[in-house]
Amino acid sequence: MLAERTRNEAPSDEGFTLIEMIVATLLFSLVTITIAGVIISATTAERSVRTVTSATSAGQLVMRTLDAGLSSAASPITVTATGSDQYIVARVPSRGATLTWGCSAWYFSSADRTIRQTTSSSSISISASGQRSWTLLADGVRQVGTTPVFAASGTIGAVVTFTVDAGTTKPVSFASTITTQSPATGVGTC
């Protein structure tokens, strides 16, 4: 009687069938792939924003230092090209309590793709290898076509045009004409 009873009992409906397990696995995989895609997209976008921000900050630093130096410089402001490298030299006032004049220079190296800057109380010696010890303002700098990075604007200023690489996105462009606001002349040369 006991053996007969176990044979007649209905099979248990507990647990999952193989098809239910396959469907659940496929749904879980689909959700996981979607979430992974969103995370990868967000990471890529964040990386792009970071490189553009870094390039923008470097270019703005170059423009700020040029503007601060050249807008108060005594004329003449000298813009020179040596091969594909270019540099600006200007006689600038000190920021101290008494007015003294010093020299500032900005150097674009096409080989290193950098813009560097230095200041001195006396004249500045310009050489392609010597400028590597100067303060680095920006790297990844390129000319815009055949337009020089630094070009003279008479004897009282400079036209500055360049791009800064921003990783895999479009380079960030900068262009400005900076002229001296100082009436000072004849305060020596650099």
Regions found by a protein language model. Give the residues of each.
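Type IV pilin-like appendage domain
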Residues: 82-153
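Aliphatic-rich helix starts adjacent to a transmembrane/signal segment
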Residues: 2-71
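Residue-level signal for beta-strand positions within conserved beta-sheet cores that form or flank
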Residues: 14, 102, 174
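Short linear sequence signals and composition-biased patches located at protein termini or domain-edge surfaces
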Residues: 3, 142-190
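Short, cationic motifs built from Arg/Lys/His that form the positively charged side of catalytic pockets
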Residues: 60, 71, 105, 117-118, ...
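Surface-exposed patches in mature extracellular/periplasmic domains of secreted proteins
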Residues: 78-80
